[in-house]
Amino acid sequence: MNKTKLTSWGNNREKEVVFTDIPEHGTINVGNQNSYGDCFFPKNANAFKNRELQDINYKFNSSMTMDDLITKNRIGLYGVPGKRNVTLGGAIASDTHGKDNIWGGSFARNIKDIYIQLPNNEKLVVSRDKDFDIFQSTIGGYGLTGSILGCSFIDDLPKYSNFYNKSIITGNSLEELLSKIKFQNKVFTVCWIDLLSNKKDWVIENFEENLNINKP
């Protein structure tokens, strides 16, 4: 069997593994390896990489990417990470956040229920109303509760525009930066601070919906 080198985000660890479609004891789920943190490595030489779900009618399976969801399915989501090929399973497992996290929260806000296979091979649908402990531990649990196979989303998802105005604010004191962030009410906000500078120079980029453009 062909082995693939699995590395951590910081490339400080690596291991050769065989990707399998069948979750087994000792394996661990792998998405597209876009986590900003150094995630877990499988105990043995196998890593589970789910490609398709054949046994359920869940529209959103764990191998779908943010690009599949947003671009192809036109779904608005909270807490969208900064890379388009992050998998849905990975976004749930790490409970991602995005440039909307000041008001939108994390990826957990999107999730209605999760279809999961436990280490004993039992398959469950867990939610805030059913098996809440497993549901809560799975979101942000990096797959340690079991294999995330799919999910469904809440009905009240955000609706985003195709057109935004960008504004840029600059300054050079932390006090001013914090006051500016506190009173921002934008859809997306990005901030950089130059910590190597004695002046603590900073930049804020804000994005808000452009209501003057006719939407297609």
What residue ranges belong to the model's regions?
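A short, structural micro-pattern
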Residues: 42, 80, 86, 108-110, ...
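Glycine-rich N-terminal segment of FAD-binding domains in flavoprotein oxidoreductases
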Residues: 2-85, 91-100, 191
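C-terminal substrate-binding/cap subdomain adjacent to the FAD-binding core in PCMH-type
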Residues: 93, 111-216
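Helix N-cap and loop-to-helix transition residues
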Residues: 49, 65, 87, 131, ...
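"Short basic amphipathic alpha-helical interaction patches in structured regions
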Residues: 73-74, 104, 128-132
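Structural signature of FAD isoalloxazine-binding scaffolds in flavoprotein oxidoreductases
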Residues: 20, 37-54, 100-121, 147-154
